[in-house]
Regions:
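Short strand-coil-strand connectors
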Residues: 116, 137-139, 157, 215-219, ...
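Extended, aromatic/histidine-rich regions of cofactor-dependent oxidoreductases associated
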Residues: 241-245, 255-259, 264-266, 270-308
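Surface-exposed beta-loop interaction hotspot
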Residues: 139-204
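Mid-length scaffold segments of soluble, non-membrane domains
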Residues: 88-90, 95-104, 203-247
Length: 308
């Protein structure tokens, strides 16, 4: 090898390797959340859901509902009471008096009811029509007055109810990122009310929030949510083809965040849950409105826990 060739060879060996040219930046493709993230989030959500359901005032404690007639009606654990209270409530606990749209309650002597932690000696009761109702408590039993159209009823709960004590959980479909979909909220051209049927046989008028348009397995579907006053979420009452054999027959509930500035809403069907009527025959549940029964099996969220 000549002297010049040797020098060039040594110089090339001593030089650092050339850095590769940077690749042009690629536009990031949209990705679904990893399945394990969806599973963990669903598990955390469901733990909170079960905590609320099994709380001392949860739906598992609902043991009675009596619609009041005009005039006086007795309340107590004695057979023949107009408003039946579970033992260990006194056989004669007091008297309800309905006068038109107002209801009062007079405790019987020795029945130590409380209202907001203070002794209640009698008087008018606030219903659930506009905000939180008055809740009277006596031991493990509590009751409140609810209004449903022209009906006024006494809703009775018992924290020692068998349904609460014997509760063993609710089966879930395996969480899947495929059921966390992005929807587009199409607003109504003008404000309108949605006719929502109920298990009581009449329909309630609820404020429409528009129409959610989304795609599952390449097919477009639509759902109509309702907008509850003061809520930061959309409320959806829907049915699907799993109601026939795997989920609660009357449909399920789903909540979703309000749309972003572009009208996008994330629908996480992994969080679809059973209405109170799946656990007690004394609830007054809304049912899916016309158009909210999907012609697809939504195999996500809670499965059937028992019909009533």
């Amino acid at each position: 090898m000549s002297t010049l060739a040797l020098v060039l060879s040594l110089a090339l060996q001593a030089s650092p390797p050339a850095k590769p040219l940077p690749k042009p930046a690629a536009q990031a493709a949209p990705r679904k959340a990893p399945a394990e993230d969806v599973a963990a989030a669903t598990q955390a959500w469901h733990a909170e859901r079960l905590q609320r359901l099994t709380s001392p005032d949860g739906w598992l404690t609902l043991v009675g509902l009596t619609w009041l007639k005009e005039g006086e009606q007795t309340a107590g654990s004695a057979p023949g009471s107009a408003v039946v209270l579970p033992a260990p409530a006194p056989s004669r606990a007091g008297t309800f008096v309905r006068k038109g749209d107002s209801v009062s309650f007079q405790p019987a002597p020795g029945a130590a009811f409380t209202l907001e932690g203070k002794p209640f000696t009698g008087g008018a009761l606030k219903t659930d029509e506009k905000g939180a109702p008055d809740v009277l408590r006596l031991g493990s039993v509590n009751f409140q007055v609810i209004r449903r159209q022209e009906r006024l009823g006494v809703r009775v709960k018992d924290s020692e109810a068998a349904a609460r004590k014997q509760f063993h959980g609710i089966p879930l479909y395996p969480a899947s990122a495929d059921w966390k979909v992005e929807a587009r909220l199409v607003p109504d051209e003008k404000p309108r009310m949605l006719s929502v049927p109920t298990v009581l046989g009449y329909s309630e008028e609820m404020k429409s929030a528009g129409t959610l348009v989304f795609t599952v397995a390449g097919k477009e579907y639509r759902l109509m949510p309702v907008a509850e006053d003061g809520s930061d979420e959309l409320f959806i009452i829907f049915g699907d083809e799993t109601n026939r054999d795997a989920t609660y027959g009357a449909g399920r509930f789903l909540e979703a965040p309000l749309p972003d500035k572009d009208g996008r809403v994330v629908l996480d069907f992994n969080r679809a849950y059973n209405p109170p009527c799946a656990f007690t025959r004394f609830a007054t549940c809304p049912l899916p409105p016309r158009g909210n029964r999907l012609a697809v099996r939504v195999e996500a969220g809670e499965k059937r826990a028992g019909d009533h």
